[in-house]
């Protein structure tokens, strides 16, 4: 019986290769904590992260290009689908940018309602962050508590706009419609019960020693590095930088509200957690003040060539019917110019840049998304961390890939 030998190529001769202490693996997009839309390329030395590189684009939809083929008012529905956990914030930044180009003034009641709805949306966004962040680390129970409270807010948003996740409630020149009858009473009911819910969250998570061990001293970034990386929102304030656009560059009447800019100095996952927890309490305070400031009045600007008329006016005035037809069929011309409008969204600075060459459609729309910028600092935060800590660091940034990929 003959035998044969097979020559093994040198590159596969593992006996003669020195052992390499590093290896490269993919985390996601199938990993539960990356939710199917984010991949990280991790270079590991044992359990320690040497380098992490985010790989994005799994949720790319070409939103910014879509704006160029749609009239200004049609772009509102696109903004809903960026950060789909904070759609009203997206609506607000976009409509305010267009209103700047048009130079139209918004009625006081519409301004107050915008603040009211945005702060409710901020709480809802933070509730999703808290539930999923804790769930990824291993604290399962609080997830259900958070979504119980979020459901109450989504019911309020649905009552006002007809939509839950994609409300498109803010319109260029004001609001889609006024608040429905009994809305203020329903908000007060939510307000009365929310402090008790926050106390439950603290009992379940803040006092959890395992959660503390998983977050304290993890994902550290100094104030100087946070500024250099361009972080904003809770991710920046968690490093002790007191920057909030609602106070530093107030818009839609925020200068009239009393609230604290929440900061924590430690710069780790735990600090960013505490900032968002306290921010929910501050948003609760702002909602209370907005309810007190609500006064009767119009919710649409006096700009008949831009703002759709009421249904009753269309039935009784021919000019209102004509304006409605022209706005829907042809849109409205926006003066040529450029504008950048930033707001303090739930995840940080959300900025909208619009370039108009005149006409009913924008020449260019670009968004400065907080999640995109905050994610860029992940390699810095995760260097030297353990593999298990990556999940906690990602959660502390509160990123949404719909806004990152656009």
Task: Give the positions of each predicted feature.
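Metal/cofactor-centered catalytic core regions of large enzymes
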Residues: 1-406
């Amino acid at each position: 019986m003959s035998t044969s030998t097979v020559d093994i190529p040198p590159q596969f001769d593992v006996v003669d290769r020195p052992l390499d202490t590093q290896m490269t693996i993919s985390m996601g997009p199938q990993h539960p904590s990356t939710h199917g839309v984010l991949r990280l390329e991790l270079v590991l030395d044992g359990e320690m992260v040497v380098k992490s590189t985010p790989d994005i684009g799994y949720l790319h939809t070409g939103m910014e290009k879509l704006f160029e083929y749609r009239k200004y008012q049609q772009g509102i529905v696109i903004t809903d689908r960026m950060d789909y956990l904070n759609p009203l914030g997206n609506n607000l930044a976009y409509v305010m940018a267009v209103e700047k180009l048009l130079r139209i003034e918004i009625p006081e009641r519409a301004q107050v309602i915008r603040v009211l709805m945005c702060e409710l949306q901020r709480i809802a966004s933070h509730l999703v962050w808290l539930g999923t962040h804790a769930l990824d680390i291993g604290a399962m129970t609080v997830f259900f508590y958070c979504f119980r409270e979020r459901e109450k807010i989504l019911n309020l948003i649905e009552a006002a706009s007809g939509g839950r996740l994609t409300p498109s409630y803010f319109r260029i020149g004001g609001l889609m419609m006024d608040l429905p009858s009994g809305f203020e009473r329903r908000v007060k009911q939510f307000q009365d019960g929310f402090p008790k819910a926050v106390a439950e969250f603290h009992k379940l998570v803040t006092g959890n020693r395992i959660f503390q061990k998983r977050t304290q001293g993890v994902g550290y970034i100094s104030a100087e590095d946070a500024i250099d990386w361009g972080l904003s929102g809770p991710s920046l304030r968690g490093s002790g930088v007191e920057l909030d656009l609602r106070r530093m560059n107030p818009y839609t009447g925020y200068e009239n509200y009393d609230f604290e800019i929440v900061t924590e100095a430690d710069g780790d996952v735990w600090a960013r957690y505490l900032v968002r927890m306290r921010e929910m309490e501050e948003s609760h305070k702002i909602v209370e003040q907005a309810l007190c400031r609500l006064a009767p009045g119009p919710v649409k600007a006096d700009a008949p060539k831009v703002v759709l008329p009421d249904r009753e006016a269309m039935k009784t005035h021919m000019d209102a019917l004509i304006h409605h037809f022209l706005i829907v069929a042809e849109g409205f011309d926006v003066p040529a110019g450029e504008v950048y409008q930033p707001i303090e969204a739930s995840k940080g600075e959300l900025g909208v840049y619009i370039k108009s060459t005149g006409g009913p459609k924008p020449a260019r729309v670009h968004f400065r998304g907080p999640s995109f910028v905050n994610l860029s600092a992940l390699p810095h935060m995760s260097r030297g961390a353990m593999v298990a800590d990556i999940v906690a660091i990602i959660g502390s940034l509160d990123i949404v890939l719909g806004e990152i990929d656009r």
